[in-house]
Every structure is written in C-alpha cells, then in structure tokens.
Amino acid sequence: MQNSILVLGGAHIDRRGRLDGPTRMGASNPGRWLEEPGGGAFNAACNLARLGHSVRLISPRGGDAAGEQVSAAAERLGIDDCPVVFLDRATPSYTAILEDDGNLVIALADMALYDLFSARRLRARTTRESLADTRTILCDANLPAETISA
C-alpha cells in the first residue's frame, strides 16, 4: 500500500445505552442499546477511507469476538486492517449510559490494553514494514507517550 495513510491507535467496541425516560438510580431502566466499533484511530481511519484514501490501521486488540468485529468493520470499508493481537486479553471497550436527552449518566472505559501497546510492539517486522511503506502517519494521542515518540 505505497503512499497509504497509516493510522495508529485505538480501535475498540463502543456501547451506548439510552434510557427511554428519566434516570431512576438503583433501579432497572428501560432503554435501547447500540454496539459498534469505535475508537479515535478507528473512526479516523473510517472517515479517511470514506473520503477515498488508501488507509492502513494498526491497533491493539484482544483475541476475542470483539476484536474480530472491529476487523470485519474495517475490512468492509476497505481499510487494510493490521491488528496487534494480544490473545490472552479482551479487546478494549467503552460503555456509556445516556439519559433520554442524550446526556451522559455514567461510562466505563475498559482501555487497559492500550497501555500494553509499547514502542517494542512497533519493532515487529510487519509493523516496521507498514511504517516504512507510508508517508503519512496519523497517531492516536491516547497511546503511551513512549509509543508515540517511537
């Protein structure tokens, strides 16, 4: 993918629950649920692909169904998906509960896997080749500082 845009960073599962009425703390609340791939790097890669750019995505994922869901969504958009898979970990996720007007009630960001995406991971052969094969790199600033500076 010579001259592609390389996007490096977060690609995870976003979950949003939206309540049908006012929040009743400490009780079950009726509402709707939406689950889809997201994350800063994933969303940027999707938008670049929609604009017609050749895009390669490198992001840490777990060896689970959620990681496969992110990969499948990227591939549907024509993104060259190159996940760094941690087989013994879960793919990161963000879960938000929203009031009926869209305001956030509470959220859970399960993003610990991103902290394991160290500069050493960038030295893997396939990642090095991807970095060498591109002129433009977009990097998610939520990655560890040592990874970004590498």
Model-assigned labels for residue ranges:
Residues 1-60, 65-75, 106-107, 145:
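Glycine-rich phosphate/adenosyl-contacting loop at the front of the ribokinase-like
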Residues 39, 91, 111-114:
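Generic intrinsically disordered, low-complexity segments enriched for polar/acidic and small residues
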Residues 51, 77, 89-92:
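Short, basic and Ser/Thr-rich N-terminal targeting/leader segments
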Residues 61, 86-87:
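Residue-level "edge-of-site" marker
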Residues 95:
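C-terminal catalytic lobe of FAD-dependent flavoproteins
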Residues 1-11, 56, 73-86, 98-150:
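Ribokinase/PfkB-type carbohydrate-kinase core domain
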